[in-house]
Amino acid sequence: MPPSHSVAQIRDAERQTLATGRRLMPLAGAAAARHVAARIRPGAVVLALAGPGNNGGDALEAATGLRAMGHDVRVLLPSGAQGLPADAARAYAGWQAAGGETWSTLEPGFVPGLVIDGLFGIGLNRPLGADWQALVDTVNAWNVPVLALDVPSGIDADSGEALGRPIQARWTLSFIGRARGLERPGPGRDACGISEVDTLGVIMTPAN
């Protein structure tokens, strides 16, 4: 298994790569889209959960890629697009330009065939708020396959501890490197399902 890394190490590698002018979010989104396309049953609707940070941008890029492949995709953007970071805002603009459908709340009775969890990733360091927890609980109650991006939402990426009741993923696709919280025995490893890594071509130094 590839080595795991702290959030600080992953962030540092990301910053160094972005400083060269290389854009990573489109690469992450394309990798997630390929992952879903290889596993989704024909005709199933994909719901991409896009949170307020760059994890949400990865989900938006994945949604745009899947739509371009001909899949039926919806985006749930509970916190709106106004406060998105620059790269995530660019991903949202691409989703809009592609004609994608964006919801702020779930449609009554809607149940997707597969969920992309791009709510928080490695950025979560405090317990899920009540509204976010309610959304996670709804997703878990659907009992449909979930692909988590980087880390299942509701997990502390460094410690692997639960920050509420986390998303229960079937797969977790980590970008750049696997967070330590997915390797250690505990809620993080239990919630992540099958853990895979796409380095996006970023070189990580081995963790100590």
From Swiss-Prot:
(6S)-NADPHX binds at N54, N55, G56, G57, D58, G121, I122, G123, L124, N125, R126, P127, D150. It is an enzyme of class 5 (isomerase). Residues 10-208 form the YjeF N-terminal domain. PROSITE patterns: YJEF_N. Its cofactor is K(+). This is NAD(P)H-hydrate epimerase. K(+) binds at N55, D117, S153. Catalyzes the epimerization of the S- and R-forms of NAD(P)HX, a damaged form of NAD(P)H that is a result of enzymatic or heat-dependent hydration. This is a prerequisite for the S-specific NAD(P)H-hydrate dehydratase to allow the repair of both epimers of NAD(P)HX. It comes from the Bacteria. Keywords: Isomerase, Metal-binding, NAD, NADP, Nucleotide-binding, Potassium. Binds 1 potassium ion per subunit.
